[in-house]
Amino acid sequence: MKRQLLMCTALAMAGLACLVVSPSVIAGLSTAKGPTAKTIQPQPVASSAPDNDESLIQRGYDLAPVPLNLTGKNRALVGLGSYIVNTSGCNDCHTNPPYVAGGDPFAGEPEQINVDCYLSGGVDFGIVISRNLTPNSQGLPAGLTLDQFIHVLRTGEDLKSPGNPPFDHGLLQVMPWPVFGKKSDRDLTAIYEYLRSIPHRSRCLSPA
């Protein structure tokens, strides 16, 4: 080991890099066998990765297309909910029409969301019309309490209407509730808190 250090010093003086490895480490590497031979234990990603909630919350506020009423609301959940809602295509089905004239990105135009009808429902899918998600006069998004809101997204059960043939048991159609139902309680609560903060709008129906 002493000889190795002397050689390393000489190399360093010559401007060359040097790595000294102890004999015990070399012995450990040479005698290791099979899949259990590990000299370094990697740290779990979760423990070393930074918490990016703050960036998602700020991104949510940046994406919100309407003024938000934050009185009595959890600001962090509102921001996170805005991020989820505004990056999950909710506007495409729950705003009628989703974009103002000249603001449809699918037509190659700069995106301009229709804020006058934002998330107020009214898109006609033939036998299904999208729901108004804005707060009612009691401040309840879609007229649902938080528990009801989470129940709907977990089960798809339509609490507003009975089942209509061919759709039995009042299950929501078109709305991708099986996807949203897999989100955490915190994420669903954040969506609800965001919807509580947006302005009320009457349903915007399609022109006759």
In which residue ranges do the predicted regions lie?
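Surface-exposed patches in mature extracellular/periplasmic domains of secreted proteins
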Residues: 92-96, 161-168, 172, 202-208
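The canonical Cys-X-X-Cys-His
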Residues: 81, 87-97, 149, 191, ...
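Positively charged n-region of N-terminal signal peptides that target proteins for export
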Residues: 1-4
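Signal peptide processing junction and immediate N-terminal pro/mature segment
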Residues: 20-41
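Electrostatic cytochrome c docking/interface patches
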Residues: 52-86, 100
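Electron-transfer interface patches adjacent to heme c in soluble/periplasmic c-type cytochromes
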Residues: 109-152, 177-187
